């Protein structure tokens, strides 16, 4: 066998099982040359609340406690041998209505936490300050008001992904601007299918991805996205009210590359200047809206635009036609959107600007 292949087999992970708490499954993954490093994944899902606190191996990296009808977790339950070095914890599909402010205080290495599909109604301040979290899933709960500061973590600048979709959130309390109080390092925030009537104040968060899908937003006007200059992907699909897109509503997003407005059938044009300021936008999804046909001035406001989705199977791509050469002084190449219906591959005539 060739040496490179032997090395690949030696370094890649191998999986074996080991003795475990009755009803649980312990799977060992080994890594490195000669299996010199191992981690254990423990699955204790679906056993019932009586299993807590369940003993786990000292080298446990991920613990699955989902679907156990758990009604409470606190610091003492998550402080036994093997718990303090956890990197991943799954508490989804339980009956949790609240969590102790110090519940995760001893999980100093926790990177991924899943609390989805519970009945949480509140999130204590500083819930995650002791853990270097990079992923927090709080979707499908009963949260109504959430403080952005609750997601301040011991991450030392690591990007944080937060999923708050499918809650009852009507207000997001902004992070205070007091000196010396670091802002959460949230780079991806999913607020889809909540009860937000306005774009929340997320100023100064290092956001790159934001989803507000399915919210009853009434208006998106100037200043709505102030302080979010680093945002690259914004999704406003399937909004539950007829949103008004005011001119320059996206002006604060010069770095935005992807904008999704799909699934808003009552959305009408308020003028191409709605998109002014989006100098980096490359992809625009208008499928399922009333924003077709496209206005001729669209590409003038979107100089970097490469593709537009205008229907379930219709995509338009930017087309540059050089025209006659040599070009007349002061003239510019003609720019068009060339649209194709992928169902029948019939091309629509390009719109020349």
UniProtKB/Swiss-Prot annotation:
Signal peptide range equals: 1-16
Any one of the GO BP annotations: ciliary body morphogenesis
Q: Explain what induces or represses this protein's expression.
A: By 17-beta-estradiol.
Task: Pinpoint the residue ranges of every LRR repeat in the record.
Answer: 59-80, 85-106, 109-130, 132-153, 159-179, 185-206, 207-227, 230-249, 255-276, 280-301
GO annotations of cellular component type:
extracellular space
Superkingdom of the source species? Eukaryota
Which UniProt keywords are present, listed alphabetically?
Developmental protein, Glycoprotein, Leucine-rich repeat, Neurogenesis, Repeat, Secreted, Signal
| Any further remark recorded for this protein | This factor is named 'Tsukushi' because its expression pattern in chick embryos is similar to the shape of the Japanese horsetail plant, tsukushi.
- State the protein's purpose: Contributes to various developmental events and other processes such as wound healing and cholesterol homeostasis through its interactions with multiple signaling pathways. Wnt signaling inhibitor which competes with WNT2B for binding to Wnt receptor FZD4 and represses WNT2B-dependent development of the peripheral eye. Plays a role in regulating the hair cycle by controlling TGFB1 signaling. Required for the development of the anterior commissure in the brain by inhibiting neurite outgrowth. Essential for terminal differentiation of hippocampal neural stem cells.
Name assigned to this protein? Tsukushi
Record organism = Homo sapiens (Human)
Gene for this chain: TSKU
């Amino acid at each position: 066998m060739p040496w490179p292949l032997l090395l690949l087999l030696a370094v890649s992970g191998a999986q074996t099982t080991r003795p475990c708490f009755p009803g649980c499954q312990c799977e060992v993954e080994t890594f490195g040359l000669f299996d010199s490093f191992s981690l254990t994944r423990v699955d204790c899902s679906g056993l019932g609340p009586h299993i807590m606190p369940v003993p786990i191996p000292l080298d446990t990296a991920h613990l699955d406690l989902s679907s156990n009808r758990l009604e409470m977790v606190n610091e003492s339950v998550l402080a036994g041998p093997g718990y303090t070095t956890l990197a991943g914890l799954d508490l989804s599909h339980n009956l949790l209505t609240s969590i102790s402010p110090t519940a995760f205080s001893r999980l100093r290495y926790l990177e991924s936490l899943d609390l989805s599909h519970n009945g949480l109604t509140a999130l204590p301040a500083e819930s995650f300050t002791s853990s270097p979290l990079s992923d927090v899933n709080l979707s499908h709960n009963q949260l109504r008001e959430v403080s952005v500061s609750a997601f301040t973590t011991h991450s030392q600048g690591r990007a944080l992904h937060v999923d708050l979709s499918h809650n009852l959130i009507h207000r997001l309390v902004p992070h205070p601007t007091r000196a010396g109080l670091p802002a959460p390092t949230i780079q991806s925030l999913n607020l889809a299918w909540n009860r937000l009537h306005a774009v929340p104040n997320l100023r100064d968060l290092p956001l790159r991805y934001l989803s507000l899908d399915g919210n009853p937003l009434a208006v998106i006007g100037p200043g709505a996205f102030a302080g979010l200059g680093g945002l690259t992907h914004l999704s406003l699909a399937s909004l539950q009210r007829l949103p008004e897109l005011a001119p320059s509503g996206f002006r604060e997003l010069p770095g935005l590359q992807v904008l999704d407005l799909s699934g808003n059938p009552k959305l009408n044009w308020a003028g191409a200047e709605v998109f002014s300021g989006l100098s980096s936008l490359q992809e625009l999804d208008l499928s399922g809206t009333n924003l077709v046909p496209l206005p001729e001035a669209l590409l003038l406001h979107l100089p970097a635009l490469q593709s537009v989705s205008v229907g379930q199977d219709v995509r338009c791509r930017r087309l540059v036609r050089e025209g006659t050469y040599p070009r007349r002084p002061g003239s510019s190449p003609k720019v068009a959107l060339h649209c194709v219906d992928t169902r029948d591959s019939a091309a629509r005539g390009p719109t020349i600007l």
